[in-house]
């Protein structure tokens, strides 16, 4: 069954394994999450657990948010996300989910929001090749032909535009270390997002098969 936690990307560092191998890791701070709601098929049409992360100031919370938090006997949260495919009997409204949910060696999927790069051209945005630089060439970084038949730009054509700020999931990363007293997970490799951005860590369904 799926297990997961919400956290914050702190940055990257490197640690040594017991065998003396240097491993680059991403540090994720995941203070205890609060179970805000347990959704069932009878009441909601599907099964899920709703987790809340990071307290939100009362003055910034509206009445529905405060009422939702009161049911879980907690304060309003900045980030609320749902986990599906979980064992509902393991969760109770108002209980906490900590980093000890995971252990070293677990394989996880990490979801975050990619860093924004503003308005970019085809070469940076879609990794296309440059045009010739010499011999009278008049195209170097332009998108190129839009097509010669249909007198319009076909849907899905790779063109310049806004790059980044998309939801990205990297699968099958390994939990290298769990520091329970500091609410920290160290995950091998890099994860999407800028520093201090919200991260969702879930157990990998593919790895368990």
UniProtKB/Swiss-Prot annotation:
Keyword RNA-binding found: yes
A UniProt-annotated Pfam family: Ribosomal_L3
GO biological process, one term: translation
InterPro entries named in the record: Ribosomal_uL3, Ribosomal_uL3_bac/org-type, Ribosomal_uL3_CS, Transl_B-barrel_sf
Keywords, alphabetical: Ribonucleoprotein, Ribosomal protein, RNA-binding, rRNA-binding
Listed GO MF terms: rRNA binding; structural constituent of ribosome
Disulphide bridges: none
One of the record's GO cellular component terms: cytosolic large ribosomal subunit
Domain of life: Bacteria
Residue span of region Disordered: 113-155
Function: One of the primary rRNA binding proteins, it binds directly near the 3'-end of the 23S rRNA, where it nucleates assembly of the 50S subunit.
PANTHER family, sorted: 50S RIBOSOMAL PROTEIN L3 (PTHR11229), LARGE RIBOSOMAL SUBUNIT PROTEIN UL3C (PTHR11229:SF16)
Entry similarity comment: Belongs to the universal ribosomal protein uL3 family.
Assembly and interaction partners: Part of the 50S ribosomal subunit. Forms a cluster with proteins L14 and L19.
Protein name according to UniProt: Large ribosomal subunit protein uL3
Origin species: Lactobacillus delbrueckii subsp. bulgaricus (strain ATCC 11842 / DSM 20081 / BCRC 10696 / JCM 1002 / NBRC 13953 / NCIMB 11778 / NCTC 12712 / WDCM 00102 / Lb 14)
Lineage: Bacteria, Bacillati, Bacillota, Bacilli, Lactobacillales
Gene label: rplC
């Amino acid at each position: 069954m799926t297990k997961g936690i919400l956290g914050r990307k702190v940055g990257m560092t490197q640690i040594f394994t017991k065998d003396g191998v240097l491993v680059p890791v991403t540090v994720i701070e995941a203070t205890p999450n609060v179970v805000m709601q347990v959704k069932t098929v009878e009441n909601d049409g599907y099964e899920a657990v709703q987790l809340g992360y990071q307290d939100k100031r009362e003055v910034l919370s509206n009445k529905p948010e405060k009422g939702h938090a009161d049911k879980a006997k907690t304060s309003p949260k900045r980030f609320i996300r749902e986990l599906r495919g979980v064992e509902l009997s393991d969760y109770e409204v108002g209980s906490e989910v900590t980093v000890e949910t995971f252990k070293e060696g677990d394989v996880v999927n990490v979801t975050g929001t990619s860093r924004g790069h503003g308005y970019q051209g085809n070469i940076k945005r879609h990794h296309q090749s440059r045009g010739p630089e010499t011999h009278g060439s008049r195209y170097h970084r332009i998108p190129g032909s839009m097509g010669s038949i249909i007198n319009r730009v076909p849907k899905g054509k790779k063109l310049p535009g806004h790059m980044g700020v998309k939801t990205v999931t990297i699968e099958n990363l390994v939990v290298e270390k769990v520091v329970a007293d500091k609410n920290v997970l160290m995950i091998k490799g890099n994860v999407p997002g800028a520093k201090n951005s919200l991260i969702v860590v879930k157990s990998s369904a593919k790895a368990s098969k």
